[in-house]
Structures are given as structure tokens and as C-alpha cells.
UniProtKB/Swiss-Prot annotation:
Pathway: Amino-acid biosynthesis; L-arginine biosynthesis; N(2)-acetyl-L-ornithine from L-glutamate: step 3/4
GO MF annotation terms: N-acetyl-gamma-glutamyl-phosphate reductase activity; NAD binding; NADP+ binding
Entry keyword set: Amino-acid biosynthesis, Arginine biosynthesis, Cytoplasm, NADP, Oxidoreductase
CDD domains hit by this protein: AGPR_1_C, AGPR_1_N
Protein's organism: Escherichia coli O157:H7
Name of the featured protein: N-acetyl-gamma-glutamyl-phosphate reductase
Gene Ontology CC: cytoplasm
PANTHER family: N-ACETYL-GAMMA-GLUTAMYL-PHOSPHATE REDUCTASE, CHLOROPLASTIC-RELATED (PTHR32338:SF10), N-ACETYL-GAMMA-GLUTAMYL-PHOSPHATE REDUCTASE, CHLOROPLASTIC-RELATED-RELATED (PTHR32338)
Gene: argC
Length: 334
């Protein structure tokens, strides 16, 4: 049994982690923590997230020193802000824990990236070298030996799962950059109250145009430039990405289908559509990424959907943990 600590459990992704870990037959929750300054410290997780009432009624304990919680812990999930994960991950690693970080603090092996896109100076270049990028379907072998796993961002997960098989099969004309138009539910902005995320204010609107930090994450791990425009949708959760690409001359629809099938035939958390494209409602509350596509001449449109809190965060983190410790990838997820 893996003793498991969830840090930052009060947020939306944190609550999903609690759900997944609680029903995992090989994991035991030792504690749920929040920062010592959090207004949620001392509250029950089930008071903040009533879907957990009668299932997990543990308190959210304030954490100011990891030594209060790290002894005997095997696994730590960090559902914390980027700067917080940056500071906590090395401490838990030194304490002998395997760390799964849901923030962006260790996703890109380039210290200058964090100054430009995250606004802080990265102090641990050696950990950037060591961290395994947790795109579970593609990086499984690296995960098996890693002690620090950087769980990908929500948008990058869907984008890479859709595009990587086609790039690796050399089917795309990358002189025309793939264009990713992505829409996420409001939960992607976190649980903290903000006027812009309130019911009467939120609308379908692009944001972070040409400046969003997920663009370089996608491009770095694909090894190809992309144009990425995120949108905030007026619904609670889920991501839908419509990706427009140009195929190389002579590439057929059958070749696109074959590349996707070969990539995901034995990957249970990616579901491919033989016909049509996926709808968001079919992945909300589930750990899958659904992918469909259409071809017209040299033009390809791929649609990928996922739950941003599950396949885009908590479920993928647990999927990575399953791979790391040799369990079935879908353990506790489906």
C-alpha cells in the first residue's frame, strides 16, 4: 500500500485527486493539506466538495513545514500553484517521496522559459533535467524510473495526443503550422473567486492570444511550431480543441486513421472515432481523451475532447502513478 499525501487538496483538481486516490486499491491517503494561510485550513474536504460527503471526510490540514507530513509517505501529489510546487517538490524528493506535480513548474527543461511565461526564476535546473514529462500514452517508459513527474497542462494533453501520432508518422506539412483553437470550462481558471469568472460575466472569449504559456509547452514536446489560441467557455468543465493542419501531398484519410490507430490501439484512455468528431458531453466526468478527424484534400481537421480536471489533470496524474508503480493504467479511473 502506497501512503499518499495530497497537497493543495481544496481546489477542483485536488478534489478529483482525492476521489481517484481514495478508491485506489493500492493507495492510502495519509493526509490532505493546504497552505497554512488558506481560509480552508481546518475544514473538511467534504464540506468544500459535498460530492465527497460520506466518502472522504478528512480535514484539510495546514502545512507550513513538510516534515510534519513527509515521514512514511511514498507518494505526493502537488495540486499547487507553480511557484509553490517549485519550492515543495525538492523538499519532498529529499524526503524520499515520489512526486507528481500538477503545476507547470517542471514541464519544460529550459530555465528561461519560467522567467518568460511563469514570472519566476527557476532555481532547480538539475530537477528540470531529471523530471519526466507525464504525457502518459507517450512517455510511459520514462515514468517507470522517475521520482519527479511533471503532469502536462490540460490544453497540451489534448493537443499532443491529437497531433503527435501524425507528426511522428511524417504526415503533416509543418511549413503550415497547426492551428489549435481550444475552449475550456471555467474550472480551468481554478476555484478562487474572480469577477471575470462569475456567472454573469463569463462568456465565450479568447484569452492569452500569442502569449499563453501552454503554446511553448505544446511546441517543445511536439518538436513543431503551432499556433494556439485558448478560449474560456461559459460551462463548468471540459476542453474541446479543434486543430487545423495541412497534410503532405498524397497523404490520405486512411493513412491518418492508421497512424492514430497504431498509436492508441492499446491505450485505453484514448478513444478514437471512426466517423464524426467527439462532443464535450461524452468526456465530462471521465478520464478519456476522445479524438476524431475529417480530411478534405490536403486539409485535416482534428477534434480532441477531455475533462480538464481529469485527463487534463488529476486522472492523468493517477495514470502516471499507475505506470510508475506497475499497476494497470486505468486502476481507480474506470
Amino acid at each position: 500500500m502506497l501512503n499518499t499525501l495530497i497537497v493543495g487538496a481544496s481546489g477542483y483538481a485536488g478534489a478529483e485527486l482525492v476521489t481517484c486516490v481514495n478508491r485506489h486499491p493500492h493507495m492510502n491517503i495519509t493526509a490532505l493539506t493546504v497552505s497554512a494561510q488558506s481560509n480552508d485550513a481546518g475544514k473538511l474536504i467534504s464540506d468544500l466538495h459535498p460530492q465527497l460527503k460520506g466518502i472522504v471526510d478528512l480535514p484539510l490540514q495546514p502545512m507550513s513545514d513538510i516534515s510534519e507530513f513527509s515521514p512514511g509517505v511514498d507518494v505526493v501529489f502537488l495540486a499547487t500553484a507553480h511557484e509553490v510546487s517549485h519550492d515543495l517538490a525538492p523538499q519532498f524528493l529529499d524526503a524520499g517521496c515520489v512526486v507528481f506535480d500538477l503545476s507547470g513548474a517542471f514541464r519544460v527543461n529550459d530555465a528561461t522559459f519560467y522567467e518568460k511565461y511563469y514570472g519566476f526564476t527557476h532555481q532547480y535546473p538539475e530537477l528540470l533535467e531529471q523530471a519526466a514529462y507525464g504525457l502518459a500514452e507517450w512517455c510511459g517508459n520514462k515514468l517507470k524510473e522517475a521520482n519527479l513527474i511533471a503532469v502536462p497542462g490540460c490544453y497540451p494533453t489534448a493537443a499532443q495526443l491529437a497531433l503527435k501520432p501524425l507528426i511522428d508518422a511524417d504526415l503533416l506539412d509543418l511549413n503550415q503550422w497547426p492551428v489549435i483553437n481550444a475552449t475550456s470550462g471555467v474550472s480551468g481558471a481554478g476555484r478562487k473567486a474572480a469577477i471575470s469568472n462569475s456567472f454573469c460575466e463569463v462568456s465565450l472569449q479568447p484569452y492569452g492570444v500569442f502569449t499563453h504559456r501552454h503554446q511553448p509547452e505544446i511546441a517543445t514536446h511536439l518538436g513543431a511550431d503551432v499556433i494556439f489560441t485558448p478560449h474560456l467557455g461559459n460551462f463548468p468543465r471540459g476542453i474541446l480543441e479543434t486543430i487545423t493542419c495541412r497534410l503532405k501531398p498524397g497523404v490520405t484519410q486512411a493513412q491518418v486513421a492508421q497512424a492514430l490507430q497504431q498509436a492508441y490501439a492499446h491505450k485505453p484512455l484514448v478513444r478514437l472515432y471512426d466517423k464524426g468528431v467527439p462532443a464535450l458531453k461524452n468526456v465530462v466526468g471521465l478520464p478519456f481523451c476522445d479524438i476524431g478527424f475529417a480530411v478534405q484534400g490536403e486539409h485535416l481537421i482534428i477534434v480532441a475532447t477531455e475533462d480538464n480536471l481529469l485527463k487534463g489533470a488529476a486522472a492523468q496524474a493517477v495514470q502516471c502513478a499507475n505506470i510508475r508503480f506497475g499497476y494497470a493504467e486505468t486502476q481507480s479511473l474506470i
